[in-house]
Amino acid sequence: MPLSQTGLLYKDLIGYHEYEGLALNLDEQKRLVEDLGKNKQLLILKNHGLLTCGRTIPEAFIMMYYLEQACKIQIAAQAGNEVSLPKPEVQDLVHQQAMKGFGSKLGEMEFIALKRRLARLGSDYAS
């Protein structure tokens, strides 16, 4: 739902996959790919979780982070009274601005900063 600025970042990039039980059936791989399609980078796996695809690990990570934030915002908003959606032209504008501004380096700055933070905390994530 295009409810928040964070949610608008991914307008038209989200696909949905029906829950099929535990992911033990290899045939589900084909359906996941079909639901992702050619133009989607994110999947909401109904009754299960989220999946993101990126050109790089930092891109996939940051898209997952903001998709999760958008979901949290939506759940919190829907728990209250009636939600107010931005006008369709504003939704399109925000999405276009985000896509133009992200470029090919999406997530790199954040990912590098997170790795530095882990190193400072003494994490052995890289071993």
Short names for language-model regions:
Residues M1-S127:
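Glycine-rich flexible loops
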